[in-house]
Amino acid sequence: GNRFVIIIDEWDVLIRDEAANKIVQEEYINFLRGLFKGTEPTRYIALAYLTGILPIKKYKTQSALNNFLEYTMLNPGKMAPYIGFTEAEVQAVCAAYQKDFQEVKRWYDGYLLGNYHVYNPCAVVNLIFQGTFQSYWSQTGTYESIVPLINMNFDGLKTDIVTMLSGDAVAVRTTTYQNDMVTFKNKNDVLTALIHLG
């Protein structure tokens, strides 16, 4: 028979917005697990496509989902050119809307995923519609959630952030991050969260 295609945009909104509410988070993860985990769902679901900022949350040692491919800022795989606008796409937009590509690059070239320079689509689209260069990302809820992270008192965190803001690279160990917005044991966990938040 017919099977469904399920699309969940911002799957992680409860993980981010209810960061301190473990009960809501666990109920939500259990809901996702019941919806997608195991072989039974393949009888009625052809494809599930979930978007979000954070990787899929794990409880204990088990992921909420199995039989899925996960692409993240840390491991974009073949999806790297689809996570944002590529440089070629931004050049085409700049040509179509008479924007200085070098200035757009200076403002919005935020990611290097594999071999791709990837731009934040929200920022580029806002530039086209608003007509002015500014930090559109700082007007989002995500921006508000990073301020407490930056202010955490982990040894060397603020120094590393200043180093990155000046254009230099900082090594980050990403293996201990718990894929949530409350479990931070060291500066590497905070920096990993910041990577996922963009």
Please name every model-derived segment.
Residues G1-G198:
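Phosphate-binding site recognition
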